[in-house]
């Protein structure tokens, strides 16, 4: 009971006391004394904080807008000259078609003449090779393979220049499309030179095809000579057994001069003597 009363008294005293700051001593420092209260009232401090915050936020927003607007202006100034240069470089679609048609006409005229000449030369050479091939087949079958290979090589060599001419014309047309009219006019002599070079290459291909035909003819001649030699050899082999058999028959019919006559009577006399001797002991 005594302890209970003492505890209740000690706990009840702080509850009844007002919640005020602790009293400062005589030896308290200035920092502690100044930190106890803020300068001015609480309402004036809130207004100060609001004004400072609004000014800082407004300044930041203004600087952000100024920087973004400058960047947009710079990009617009840079994009405008780029679009102008692109519009100047890209010609109209009608002009492109005209340039392509002119380039094709310039390159097609000499190219077509060269191709027709090469085709005519090949058409003249192919019948000659066709005439030579049946004779070779009658002479010897293995000789057909090199002649056919030579004809195929000649046709391939004649077709290669045509492919080169078409590739050169295609490259020239693709290169001349994006150019302007002045550049096309300046490039016309160069295209003529290229077309002349294509005609020269086609002539060289025709020459190579002629050389291939000549080589095939030489091969046919050699095969003919071999066939003739083989026929002569077969003729000699077929004639030899017949001549040998005829000579042997003649030798059997007529013996050579100075040879001894056949010994048939002597053999008959010996047989008679043997029969007499065998008969005498029996008698």
UniProtKB/Swiss-Prot annotation:
Residues 1-41 are cytoplasmic. GO terms for cellular component: axon cytoplasm; mitochondrial inner membrane; mitochondrial outer membrane; mitochondrion. Keywords: Membrane, Mitochondrion, Mitochondrion inner membrane, Mitochondrion outer membrane, Transmembrane, Transmembrane helix. Induction: Up-regulated by chorionic gonadotropin in ovary. Up-regulated by hypoxia in a HIF-1A-dependent manner in neurons and astrocytes. Up-regulated during gonad development after birth, probably under the regulation of hormones derived from the hypothalamic-pituitary-gonadal (HPG) axis. Residues 221-245 have a biased composition (Basic and acidic residues). The chain crosses the membrane at residues 42-64. It is a single-pass type IV membrane protein. Residues 65-283 are mitochondrial intermembrane. It is found in: Mitochondrion; Mitochondrion outer membrane; Mitochondrion inner membrane. Its main location: mitochondrion. GO terms for biological process: anterograde axonal transport; axon development; axonal transport of mitochondrion; cellular response to gonadotropin-releasing hormone; cellular response to hypoxia; cellular response to steroid hormone stimulus; cerebral cortex development; negative regulation of dendrite development. Disruption phenotype: Reduction of mitochondrial motion in the anterograde direction and increase of mitochondrial motion in the retrograde direction in response to hypoxia. The number of motile mitochondria is not altered. Neocortical neurons exhibit a remarkable increase of the dendritic number and the axon length. Neuronal cells show an increase in the percentage of round mitochondria and a decrease in the percentage of rod or tubular mitochondria. Residues 171-184, 199-220 have a biased composition (Polar residues). Plays a role in the trafficking of mitochondria along microtubules. Regulates the kinesin-mediated axonal transport of mitochondria to nerve terminals along microtubules during hypoxia. Participates in the translocation of TRAK2/GRIF1 from the cytoplasm to the mitochondrion. Also plays a role in steroidogenesis through maintenance of mitochondrial abundance and morphology. Plays an inhibitory role during neocortex development by regulating mitochondrial morphology, distribution and motility in neocortical neurons. Interacts with RHOT1/Miro-1, RHOT2/Miro-2, TRAK1/OIP106 and TRAK2/GRIF1. This is Protein MGARP. The gene is Mgarp.
């Amino acid at each position: 009971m005594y302890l209970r009363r003492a505890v209740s008294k000690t706990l009840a005293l702080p509850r009844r006391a007002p919640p005020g700051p602790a009293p400062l001593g005589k030896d308290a420092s200035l920092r502690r004394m100044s930190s106890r209260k803020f300068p001015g009232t609480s309402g004036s401090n809130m207004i100060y904080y609001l004004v400072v915050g609004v000014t800082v936020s407004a300044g930041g927003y203004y600087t952000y807008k100024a920087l973004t607007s400058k960047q947009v202006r710079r990009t617009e100034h840079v994009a405008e000259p780029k679009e102008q240069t692109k519009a100047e470089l890209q010609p109209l679609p009608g002009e492109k078609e005209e340039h392509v048609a002119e380039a094709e006409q310039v390159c097609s005229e000499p190219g077509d003449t060269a191709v027709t000449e090469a085709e005519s030369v090949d058409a003249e050479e192919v019948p000659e090779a066709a005439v030579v091939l049946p004779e070779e087949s009658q002479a010897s079958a293995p000789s057909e393979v090199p002649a056919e290979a030579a004809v195929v090589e000649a046709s391939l060599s004649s077709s290669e220049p045509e492919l080169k001419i078409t590739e050169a014309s295609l490259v020239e047309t693709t290169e001349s499309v994006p150019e302007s009219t002045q550049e096309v006019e300046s490039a016309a002599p160069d295209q003529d030179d290229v077309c002349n070079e294509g005609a020269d290459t086609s002539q060289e291909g025709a020459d190579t095809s002629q050389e291939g035909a000549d080589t095939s003819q030489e091969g046919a001649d050699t095969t003919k000579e071999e066939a003739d030699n083989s026929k002569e050899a077969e003729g000699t082999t077929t004639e030899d057994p017949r001549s040998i058999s005829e000579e042997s028959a003649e030798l059997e019919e007529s013996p050579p001069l100075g040879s001894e006559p056949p010994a048939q009577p002597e053999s008959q006399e010996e047989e008679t003597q043997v029969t007499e001797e065998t008969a005498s002991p029996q008698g």
